[in-house]
Amino acid sequence: MDVQPTTMRGAVKTAHLGTDVSLATKPLPKPEWLRGKSASTPDVERLVRILRDNRLHTVCEEASCPNLGECFRKGTATFMIMGDVCTRHCPFCNVAHGSPHELAADEPVNLARAVELLKLSYVVITSVTRDDLPDGGAGHYGACVRALRDLKRSLKVEILTPDFRGAVAVAFEELRMNLPDVFNHNLETVPRLYPRVRPQADYHGSLDLLLRFREQFDHVPTKSGLMLGLGETEQEVRDVMEELRRHRCDMLTLGQYMRPSPHHLPVERYVTPDEFERYRQFGLSIGFSHVESGPMVRSSYHADMQARELMLVN
């Protein structure tokens, strides 16, 4: 029996991980630079209506992204395919965990219709992790990219994928005929914190995924992202940035982790805008084509502007 998303959020989702997300943890006061704008405007309501009419989800809503208001007002969104229930239960993430439903065969067509209605020129597609599928859902990613290409207009597509654990070779074969313009896979945090932050993932496996994609599809740039404020040190962040460059990663996003609820990992520290700027400058100095670094940055925030650094967008 499928588990409904609402039954596997918050405390129920993270209780069995053995990770301390105690309600007794007093939250740090949020600094002024992290105050987002309200998402409620007529333009936002129109976008939400189009998404609902086409039975689509956005990671903006599911992950409680702090930029939801800004991006929705600009008519952009990161589409989350393959449902809104994830087979993993990372204690930093607000997406529901459970047994996912079957893939919706009409989702690629619905996605293309929504993109056309919204008149988007740069589309980001991400997904829940689907360990239940033999190819990790790569074939569905490919079908969505193909549907967007069929629109026959100038449109750039970025995919932000899971790690395709145990199925990387199969996944790449599925993507081969429908490659994106940018391949994005987030490391999320430094290796020392993986047992606490990403207990079902493998740091070196994620690095290897980025390198293998770049080696097989050399003309497609790669991208990754980190959340800061979970207890990492500055040297650890710099080490990861250097390791990403050694694995031929082209673009990087760095943003502040923000706790979705009291049942998720607490924020250990709010990183200042000046620190984010230092990371940006360091990233550029070691060869990243673009580093989007700031408290409110998320992996698909200003994705079109990030890609311009590689002349992907007119």
Swiss-Prot record:
Binding site for [4Fe-4S] cluster 1: 60, 65, 71, 300
Taxonomy, superkingdom: Bacteria
Catalytic activity field: [[Fe-S] cluster scaffold protein carrying a second [4Fe-4S](2+) cluster] + N(6)-octanoyl-L-lysyl-[protein] + 2 oxidized [2Fe-2S]-[ferredoxin] + 2 S-adenosyl-L-methionine + 4 H(+) = [[Fe-S] cluster scaffold protein] + N(6)-[(R)-dihydrolipoyl]-L-lysyl-[protein] + 4 Fe(3+) + 2 hydrogen sulfide + 2 5'-deoxyadenosine + 2 L-methionine + 2 reduced [2Fe-2S]-[ferredoxin]
Any one annotated GO CC term: cytoplasm
Pathway field: Protein modification; protein lipoylation via endogenous pathway; protein N(6)-(lipoyl)lysine from octanoyl-[acyl-carrier-protein]: step 2/2
Family matches, as Pfam families: Radical_SAM (PF04055)
Residues binding [4Fe-4S] cluster 2, per UniProt: 86, 90, 93
Comment on bound cofactor: Binds 2 [4Fe-4S] clusters per subunit. One cluster is coordinated with 3 cysteines and an exchangeable S-adenosyl-L-methionine.
Protein's cellular compartments: Cytoplasm
Major subcellular site: cytoplasm
Family the UniProt entry places it in: Belongs to the radical SAM superfamily. Lipoyl synthase family.
HAMAP family: Lipoyl_synth
Protein known as: Lipoyl synthase
Organism: Pelobacter propionicus (strain DSM 2379 / NBRC 103807 / OttBd1)
Native organism taxonomy: Bacteria, Pseudomonadati, Thermodesulfobacteriota, Desulfuromonadia, Desulfuromonadales
